[in-house]
Swiss-Prot record:
InterPro entries: Ets_dom, ETS_fam, GABP_asu_N, Pointed_dom, SAM/pointed_sf, TF_GA-bd_asu, Ubiquitin-like_domsf, WH-like_DNA-bd_sf. It comes from the Eukaryota. Signal peptide: none annotated. GO terms for cellular component: chromatin; nucleoplasm; nucleus. It comes from Mus musculus (Mouse). The gene is Gabpa. Residues 168-251 form the PNT domain. Ubiquitous. Transcription factor capable of interacting with purine rich repeats (GA repeats). Positively regulates transcription of transcriptional repressor Rhit/Zpf13. One of its GO terms (biological process) is blastocyst formation. Belongs to the ETS family. This is GA-binding protein alpha chain. CDD domains: SAM_PNT-GABP-alpha, Ubl_ubiquitin_like. Pfam families: Ets, GABP-alpha, SAM_PNT.
Amino acid sequence: MTKREAEELIEIEIDGTEKAECTEESIVEQTYTPAECVSQAIDINEPIGNLKKLLEPRLQCSLDAHEICLQDIQLDPDRSLFDQGVKTDGTVQLSVQVISYQGMEPKLNILEIVKTAETVEVVIDPDAHHAEAEAHLVEEAQVITLDGTKHITTISDETSEQVTRWAAALEGYRKEQERLGIPYDPIHWSTDQVLHWVVWVMKEFSMTDIDLTTLNISGRELCSLNQEDFFQRVPRGEILWSHLELLRKYVLASQEQQMNEIVTIDQPVQIIPASVPPATPTTIKVINSSAKAAKVQRSPRISGEDRSSPGNRTGNNGQIQLWQFLLELLTDKDARDCISWVGDEGEFKLNQPELVAQKWGQRKNKPTMNYEKLSRALRYYYDGDMICKVQGKRFVYKFVCDLKTLIGYSAAELNRLVIECEQKKLARMQLHGIAQPVTAVALAATSLQADKEI
C-alpha cells in the first residue's frame, strides 16, 4: 500500500466507535517497508486471534506479543471479525501491516479488508436487457467498510476492468446465442456452434494462440471434459475455460429459478488467472456465416387452430425467443388483427401492441407483461442483425435477417401464404356457414404445388 492509498482509507466504525481518517502525519510516524505488509485470507467467522497462527509460518517468527488491531483500533482476539462489526460473510482477504519496530508496541494492524469474488448473480429477464443489471453477473471484489454502509469501492482499476470484462463477455455471448438461435446450454451445441463460441471468445479477448482443430467436438463432448482434460487439448485455454464455466453456471441458475428473479450460485465460478487484454476501443462484431447456414430450415406454421398449451411451446433449449414468437404470430392467419406483415420486405406492424404483449406474457407466464416491456426487449435486437425499428412508422418493425436462409421462406412468401390461408378460410365460411379448419401443411403443399404447375 502506498502512502496515498493509506491517506484515502475510508472511515470505519466498530461497535459504534468511529476512527478518523489516517492523516499524513500519522503515516509518517508509522512508516513501514513493503515487506512488512502482507495479505492473508481468513474466514469472517473465525476468531481473529488465529491470524497469528496463519502468519507465523509465513513470517518465520513468533507473533505472541503482537496485538491485533484494525486501523489502530485493538480487536478482541477471541472474537471473529463478524462479531466485531465486519458485516459480510465467507472468506475475506486482509491487508496486514506487521509492526515490530524497536520502541514501538508490536502489533498486527489490519489496513484493509477485501471481499473476494465468490458469487455469480444472474438477472434472468430477457424482456429487460439492461447493461446496469448485467454488470452484476460477476460480482466485483469489494473493499469492505465496517459500518456496513455504502462505502464500497473496487480493489483497483485493473481488477474492476477485468471484472467488467467478464460480465460483458458473458452478456455478449448471451446476445450472440439469442441472435443466432444457439442453445443457452453448451451441452446442446453442435460442433459448428462450439467452434463459433471459440472464435467469438478469441476475438472478444484478442487471443491468437488457440488451435481451433483441438476443439472440433460437440457440445456434449466439450462439457464432458474436466479442467485437466481441457487444458491438455488447449494448453493456453484459461480464458476459454473460465468463459465456459460462466455459461454453464448461468444455465444452472436459470433452470433453478423462474424468470425475472435474481439468483445466487452457491458454488464459486473460478476465474483462472490469465492475462486478459483490455477492451479495444472498437467493438468487434462476430458474424459466422457458416453457423447461420448450418441452421435447420423449418416450414412455417400457418394456422389459426387453438393452442392446447401456449406456455409449454418453446424454441431452443426449452425457451422460445421473442423473434420466434413474433414470427409465429405473423404466420397465424387469426392473429392478423393484432400483428401483420407490411409489404414484402420483412416489415411488420403491431396493430394492437398491448394485445401482442399480452400474448407474449401468456407464453412466458408473465401476467404483468405490457408493450413497454415488450418494446424494451425488442430494442435488444437493434444492435444485431435480426430485427430493427422502422423509423417514422409507429409500431412498425422489420426482420433484417435473411428469413429465407433462416427458415426456408422469405417474408414475401410468408405474407402470401398467410393471406391465402385467410382468404380460403373466409371462402369456406361463406360456403358452409362455419369456419372449417385448414391445416398449415395442406395449405403450404397446395400453394407450392400450384407454383410448380404454373
